[in-house]
């Protein structure tokens, strides 16, 4: 079971975003490092995932960042063992 905090400030490129996801969620070595692969991997994750500094993520990645966040929300909706939320940036540090 994970209790992961994803830091949007570290997600400055697509590669950096997938590095953060891989590390924080202990994703398997075969994780494909794209949003479809993230969706598949999140089906196996149980626990709580919190994203901080969404503003930095969205500034750096734009539409891809928004799709990443949507993927996390959608996966949590479909996986009863996964909770996803966004932290108030004033309380994240």
Question: Which residue stretches match the model-derived regions?
Answer:
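Positively charged, polar, low-complexity stretches
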Residues: 1-93
């Amino acid at each position: 079971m994970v209790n992961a905090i994803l830091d949007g400030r570290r997600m400055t490129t697509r590669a950096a975003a997938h590095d953060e996801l891989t590390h924080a969620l202990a994703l398997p070595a075969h994780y494909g490092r794209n949003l479809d692969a993230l969706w598949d991997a999140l089906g196996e994750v149980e626990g709580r995932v919190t994203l901080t500094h969404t503003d930095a993520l969205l500034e750096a990645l734009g539409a891809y960042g928004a799709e990443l966040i949507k993927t996390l929300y959608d996966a949590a909706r479909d996986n009863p063992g996964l909770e996803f939320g966004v932290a108030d940036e004033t309380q994240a540090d």
